């Protein structure tokens, strides 16, 4: 596969990694291909624009090894997209595993209570996605779940709206301020 892509795009002005991020064929394992290229490459740093695209693909693929490889090559894990969302937002939305989310929390330098452009915090995203491991991790990092988004919805109100009784119970039992909706 790598030989095919290398030969196909050899005369292109784009790098092979730039071409890889443009592939949307589900039959091709993009993250495995990118990891192989990064490991075999002699480059010490990856362009952040390309790195961000690969990082988002890696979070949706729940590929902690690729996220770590990109981080080692200088890709900034806390970079925000046009909507103010980071790789951590995308990992939570994608239902990524606890280890990947924990790695991003510990290494991305992201304010755990920062809002995206809709006013949603990471806790809003975790509750909205019904991502219990992410909610628990965010709680250990003292994430706020009483802050409303721009529509006035707190994570607790979202849990109630979606009927996530287990989330309501989890947030209420771990709340030092009590349960206010």
UniProtKB/Swiss-Prot annotation:
ANK repeat placement: 50-79, 83-114, 118-147, 151-180
Q: Which InterPro entries match?
A: Ankyrin_rpt (IPR002110), Ankyrin_rpt-contain_sf (IPR036770)
Please provide the record's keywords in A-Z order.
ANK repeat, Repeat
Pfam families named among the record's database cross-references: Ank_2
Top-level division of the source organism's lineage:
Bacteria
Output this protein's name.
Putative ankyrin repeat protein RBE_0150
Q: Which organism is it from?
A: Rickettsia bellii (strain RML369-C)
């Amino acid at each position: 596969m790598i030989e095919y892509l290398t030969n196909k795009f050899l005369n292109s002005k784009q790098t092979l990694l730039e071409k890889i991020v443009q592939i949307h064929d589900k039959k091709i394992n993009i993250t495995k291909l990118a990891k192989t290229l990064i490991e075999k490459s002699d480059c010490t740093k990856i362009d952040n624009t390309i790195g961000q695209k690969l990082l988002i693909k890696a979070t949706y693929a729940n590929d902690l090894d690729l996220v770590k490889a990109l981080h080692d090559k200088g890709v900034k894990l806390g970079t925000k997209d046009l909507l103010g969302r980071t790789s951590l937002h995308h990992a939570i939305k994608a239902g990524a595993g606890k280890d990947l989310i924990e790695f991003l929390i510990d290494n991305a330098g992201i304010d755990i209570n920062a809002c995206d452009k809709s006013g949603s915090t990471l806790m809003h995203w975790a509750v909205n996605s019904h991502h219990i491991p992410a909610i628990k991790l965010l709680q250990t990092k003292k994430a706020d779940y009483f802050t409303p988004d721009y529509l006035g919805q707190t994570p607790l109100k979202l849990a109630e709206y979606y009927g996530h009784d287990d989330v309501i119970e989890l947030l209420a039992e771990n709340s030092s301020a009590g349960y206010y909706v």
